Regions:
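Conserved Rossmann-like nucleotide-cofactor binding loop
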Residues: 14, 37, 236
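Glycine-rich FAD pyrophosphate-binding loop
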Residues: 23-46
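Dinucleotide-binding Rossmann-like beta1-alpha1 core, especially the glycine-rich loop
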Residues: 48-114
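Active-site/ligand-binding neighborhood in enzyme catalytic cores
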Residues: 116-207, 215, 232, 237-242
Length: 313
């Protein structure tokens, strides 16, 4: 039986980052990964477009710190914060959207800032974000918030407390300051992977965790003793491990959301409409239209039941 100081299950960005941080104090680390690649949900297809995670925010402090540590600042490409909104068969800009619903706010930033900083005496975990908005916002302003956000999950599924945290920290609805990395977000996971490999940290691909015991794990290849064990996996992986069966009720309180990207590549000579195309939030099943390059467009980016709809066609 092998002995390791640290075992990490999962070679996605969370597992790689865990190994990176722990390597400052020990390199006696082994990562096991069930698939044949690292990066998890961060995956850039042929260095052209991101199939998984698609953007990063400058409010994500750990991400920004990591980019600086790996000297990747020169690869940052800021995303144009200006969007169009396709509502009731009309293409509107920000001011057009506000005017369409007779909003009392001068900008979406002002509206979102008021909402996420509003002090309420309600227990926010007892309301969806949409229901919570109804407790203090006029219907016309809620419509603007719905149409400008575009996402179903954050508006209708999350409790208000989690939604506000997500909207402030991840969605940055006040500043809308996002970026991509030239060459794809996989550059970040590649940098982490190359670093830990340079420290002689072992990554076992195509290795499935079968069960966890008090001082060892069992994989489909071998049994390994550990001093410390870290799991960087998704809910589905947790509930498949016998060790966690007693905690099934707790895991069942967590739901996993759906996201789907549909890409299309166009001949620029025949599709002049692509020129200067802005990111567009729609009120139909396309949900989001996001230009990637001059000839590559994400013709639909959807979540929740709309993502399920496209997946079942």
């Amino acid at each position: 039986m092998k002995n390791m100081t640290v075992i990490i299950v999962g070679a996605g960005i969370a597992g790689l980052y865990t190994a990176y941080k722990l390597s400052k104090t020990t390199t006696d680390i082994r990562i096991i990964e069930k698939s044949d690649r690292y990066g998890g949900r961060i995956y850039t297809y042929k260095d052209q477009y991101d199939v998984g995670a698609g953007r990063l925010g400058k409010k994500q402090k750990l991400v920004m710190k990591l980019i600086k540590e790996f000297n990747l600042e020169h690869l940052i490409v800021d995303i144009n914060p200006n969007k169009n909104y396709y509502v009731d068969e009309k293409m509107l800009d920000e001011q057009g959207l506000l005017k369409h619903y007779n909003s009392n706010y001068k900008s979406l930033s002002d509206l979102w800032s008021y909402v996420i900083n509003y002090k309420s005496k309600l227990d926010l975990k007892q309301f969806t974000f949409h229901n919570y908005l109804g407790s203090f916002m006029p219907t016309k302003e809620i419509k603007v918030l719905e149409r400008s956000l575009g996402y179903i999950n954050e508006m209708y599924r999350l409790n208000a407390a989690d939604a506000i945290y997500t909207l402030r920290k991840d969605f940055d609805v006040e500043n809308n300051d996002f970026f991509i990395l030239k060459g794809g977000l996989s550059i970040l996971s590649k940098s982490l992977y190359n670093y830990i490999i340079s420290k002689n940290i072992i990554v076992d691909f195509n290795t499935q965790l079968k069960d966890i015991k008090k001082d060892h794990i069992i994989t489909d290849r071998e049994t390994i003793k550990y001093s410390k064990l870290y799991l960087a996996v998704c809910k589905k992986a947790y509930v498949s491990i016998p060790f966690f069966e007693p905690y099934k009720d707790i895991f069942d309180t967590v739901s996993v959301g759906n996201l789907l990207r549909i890409y299309a590549k166009y001949d620029l000579n025949k599709n002049k409409w692509l020129h200067n195309l802005k990111k567009t939030v729609t009120d139909n099943k396309l949900q989001f239209i996001i230009p990637i390059t001059d000839d590559l467009v994400q013709i639909s980016y959807s979540d929740d039941y709309i993502a399920t709809y496209w997946n079942t066609l």
